[in-house]
């Protein structure tokens, strides 16, 4: 059964995003990853069973693996502790919430989030590939030796990359956060420094690249390529910490080492079945989204569970 909405009486829900419902607990937040799925920035009416659990359990796994690189916002994800905390806040009949909250919920520190998405790419794909192609097409051809380098948001890249190619070094390509229903806008590191200040921008860039390096080395040992991913950071007092989700199929492109072949798009462990089906019915990319057929739901749920199994090494 998919859980697509939550309602906890006696608590103030401060955010209902594409996937997560967030409740205000005073100094802390209660974050529930539902089974909602969005495609083309539209939330679908059908949920994907276990999706929220996969996102939460994978984030917990990565929080633990990367905590020596950067602190994170987690206080607890233990269901008994969460229910006890809710009871202490006057929420009635907390046991009835166990099934809804179990495995998909965290209590976290409340951080002031930076208004940027920290994107790191080890391979060229998605919006970066589209931008790279446009820039390359506008370059004058050079004599004899093909085109020169392409400068993407201030980063010089070779002029002969193909789609899904591994980049010489991972690159940091931040984006501005969009309102619900809009697309994030890619920006340069210099523009990010203007928005949040140079010192913080430097920390965010360093932490992003360091977490990616550690995570991609681990993932490679499990036969998974992390092509790109995005992180969000926040500040608690003087400390900069990682918040939201980390290295999940919703925030990252995971590819299978076995099937990786540059020169086109790669199959990934995410909502590709949903996107493909929507394109096949000529979905107009405007809300409301259509109900998803059972096979699309089942295949997508399997992909999310497989991502967890491949990375963590056990079943969800």
Name the predicted role of every residue range.
Residues 138, 246-307:
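C-terminal helix-cap and adjacent tail motif
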Residues 2-139, 148-178, 285-291, 295-316:
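Active-site loop/lid in soluble adenylation, ligation, and acyl-transfer enzymes
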Residues 113-115, 223-226, 237-241, 252:
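Coil-to-beta-strand transition motifs
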Residues 120, 226-246:
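Conserved metal-phosphate-binding beta-hairpin within the catalytic cores
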Residues 196-227:
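A long amphipathic alpha-helix within ATP-dependent nucleotide-binding catalytic cores
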Residues 166-198:
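A short mid-domain helix/strand-loop element embedded in enzyme catalytic domains
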Residues 144-145:
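Acidic, low-complexity intrinsically disordered tails
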Residues 53, 57, 199, 203-210, ...:
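Generic recognition of stable, solvent-exposed alpha-helical segments in well-folded globular domains
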């Amino acid at each position: 059964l998919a859980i697509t909405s939550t309602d906890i009486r006696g608590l103030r829900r401060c955010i209902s995003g594409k996937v997560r419902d967030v409740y205000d607990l005073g100094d802390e937040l209660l974050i529930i990853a539902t089974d909602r799925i969005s495609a083309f920035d539209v939330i679908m009416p059908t949920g994907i069973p276990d999706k929220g659990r996969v996102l939460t359990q994978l984030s917990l796994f990565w929080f633990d693996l990367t905590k020596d690189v950067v602190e994170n916002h987690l206080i607890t994800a233990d269901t008994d502790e969460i229910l006890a905390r809710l009871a202490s806040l006057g929420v009635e009949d907390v046991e009835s919430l166990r099934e809804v909250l179990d495995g998909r919920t965290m209590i976290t520190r409340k951080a002031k989030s930076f208004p940027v998405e920290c994107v790191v790419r080890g391979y060229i794909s998605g919006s970066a590939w589209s931008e790279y192609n446009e820039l390359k097409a506008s370059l004058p051809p050079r004599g004899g030796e093909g085109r020169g380098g392409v400068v993407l948001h201030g980063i010089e890249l070779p002029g002969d990359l193909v789609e899904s190619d591994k980049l010489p070094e991972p690159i940091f390509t931040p984006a501005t956060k969009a309102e619900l229903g809009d697309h994030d806008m890619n920006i340069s590191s210099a523009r990010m420094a203007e928005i949040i200040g140079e010192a913080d921008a430097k920390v965010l860039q360093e932490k992003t690249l360091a977490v990616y390096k550690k995570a991609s080395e681990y993932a490679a040992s499990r036969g998974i390529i992390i092509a790109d991913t995005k992180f969000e950071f926040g500040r608690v007092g003087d400390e900069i910490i990682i918040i939201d989700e980390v290295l999940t199929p919703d925030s990252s492109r995971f590819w299978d080492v076995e099937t990786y072949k540059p020169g086109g798009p790669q199959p990934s462990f995410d909502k590709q079945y949903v996107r493909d089906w929507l394109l096949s019915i000529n979905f107009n990319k405007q809300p409301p989204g259509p109900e998803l057929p059972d096979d699309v739901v089942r295949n997508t749920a399997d992909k999310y569970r497989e991502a967890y199994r491949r990375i963590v090494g056990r079943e969800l």
